[in-house]
Design a protein with these regions (language model features):
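Short clusters of hydrophobic/aromatic residues that line enzyme substrate/ligand-binding pockets
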Residues: 8-11, 24, 78, 122-125, ...
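Short acidic, glycine/serine/threonine-rich loops at helix termini
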Residues: 9-14, 69-72, 115-119, 162-165
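A charged helix-plus-loop insertion that forms the helical arch/lid used to bind
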Residues: 15-33, 79
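Short coil/turn segments at secondary-structure junctions
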Residues: 27-34, 72-76, 120-127
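Glycine-rich anion/phosphate-binding loops
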Residues: 29-49, 80-88, 130-134
Length: 222
């Protein structure tokens, strides 16, 4: 389930209203210690409530950068600075682990620098690998080093890296995430019913393409 907080919180009735991750980042800018403490508390609360309802994990936290480009990410992201995202995500995941829940970082390798919404079209990020590596990949690399259990791929095309969108890309999943970053956890596709995934063909073809690229678990949600 997506139980991020803010505008993306699927369970609301009888669940605590969780703040958007960006509001945690704003507190962090004012007081680092209080921001990190709030991140950990929110991670614990989200996870504890879901666990009590019988759910094993949430697709959280968002590791994308908060930029002016992406309204679909926007306040779902902790911060604009990669280092701040990494520190806040580590605190949030520590709270989740206190509640005995695995974490899933998303949307690899970064959805924050495109304007299009992958729910309705395929976003295209024209940056080269170096620019992505120096910014968007920093939180993912940091969380892999911290032992995050899962990573969700993005339905975003990075044509200077691969002709396939990240969720269908062996370069992103096998070469970058697995070989270079040495991620050994579970790779999830994003929802294959999203418009951003339509380039994969029919649902069976989308599933085969995602599996062939290196995804371990596929989501078809709508």
């Amino acid at each position: 389930v997506d139980q991020e907080g803010g505008r993306v919180q699927r369970f609301r009735s009888e669940f605590s209203e969780l703040p958007a991750l960006a509001s945690i980042g704003e507190l962090y800018d004012k007081d680092h210690d209080r921001g990190l403490a709030l991140a950990r508390d929110c991670g614990w609360l989200m996870a504890a409530e879901l666990r009590s309802a019988g759910l094993d994990f949430s697709f959280a936290p968002v590791l994308d950068l908060r930029t002016a480009y992406s309204s679909i990410i926007g306040d779902r992201a902790f911060h604009a600075l990669p280092g701040a995202v990494t520190r806040l995500a580590r605190a949030y995941v520590a709270g989740m682990r206190d509640a005995r829940m695995a974490a899933v970082g998303k949307h690899f390798p970064g959805h924050g620098c495109v304007t299009a919404d992958s729910h309705v079209e395929l976003p295209v990020d024209e940056r080269d690998f170096y620019d992505i590596e120096q910014a968007d990949l920093v939180p993912f690399r940091g969380m892999v080093e911290s032992g995050i259990e899962g990573i969700m791929t993005a339905h975003v095309l990075y044509p200077k890296v691969d002709r396939h969108a990240a969720g269908y890309s062996k370069i992103w999943i096998e070469d970058v995430l697995r070989a270079d970053m040495r991620f050994e956890g579970v790779v999830f596709s994003d929802d294959l019913s999203m418009a951003g995934a339509e380039a994969g063909g029919c649902y069976a073809d989308r599933a085969q393409a995602a599996l062939a690229a290196g995804c371990d678990i596929l989501l078809i949600c709508n």
